[in-house]
Amino acid sequence: MHIESKNRQIKKDIVVEITKKINDSQSLFLAEYRGLTVAKLLNLRKEAKKHNVEIKVYKNRLVKLATQKLGHSDLDKFLVGPNLFVFSNELGMDGAKVLAEFAKKNKKLVLKAGIFDGKVVDAAGVKAVAELPTYEEALTILASSLLGPLRQISLSFKLLVDENKLSN
């Protein structure tokens, strides 16, 4: 009886930990890792660490308790099978990017779902998040889209000046 209550307390502590991780992270993504070797999982963890992304394995039932407590019960239907949980600590899309990139090379890793921007997303949503540009990439895109028209205007002025020189 004493052991049972101790196990129950351990599980409650894990639910509190999961709840805190979800609250403290920018996003949460999950993927099924059935069939992946330990070596490949270690490679995934190393890659995740480079991007300040944390990978954990929890019992689905404990994650379900935490997500229900946080109002994300839509995630429940994805919590079947052996899942790993990816918490993005800095940029919300980093976890999805790490998982999607790894899944391209390792077909046994199956993207399932996640919580991004406070909403539950399915596998297609995880892939869409993975394709979002980083802040730096977005700035580059913005800068190049602004510079294009400016180049055209300056070229037009140059042509006008050259045309005026020729006519004089």
Swiss-Prot record:
The record, for InterPro entries, names: Ribosomal_uL10 (IPR001790), Ribosomal_uL10-like_sf (IPR043141), Ribosomal_uL10_bac (IPR022973), Ribosomal_uL10_bac_type (IPR047865), Ribosomal_uL10_CS_bac (IPR002363)
Gene Ontology cellular component? large ribosomal subunit
Sorted UniProt keywords: Ribonucleoprotein, Ribosomal protein, RNA-binding, rRNA-binding
The family database entries (Pfam families) matched by this protein are listed as: Ribosomal_L10 (PF00466)
User: Could you tell me which CDD domains the record lists for this protein?
Assistant: Ribosomal_L10
What GO biological process term is on the record, naming one? translation
Q: Which GO terms describe its molecular function?
A: large ribosomal subunit rRNA binding; structural constituent of ribosome
Primary role: Forms part of the ribosomal stalk, playing a central role in the interaction of the ribosome with GTP-bound translation factors.
The UniProt family comment states: Belongs to the universal ribosomal protein uL10 family.
Q: How does it assemble?
A: Part of the ribosomal stalk of the 50S ribosomal subunit. The N-terminus interacts with L11 and the large rRNA to form the base of the stalk. The C-terminus forms an elongated spine to which L12 dimers bind in a sequential fashion forming a multimeric L10(L12)X complex.
| NCBIfam families registered for this protein in UniProt | PRK00099.1-1
Q: What is this protein called?
A: Large ribosomal subunit protein uL10
Native source organism of the sequence: Mycoplasmopsis pulmonis (strain UAB CTIP)
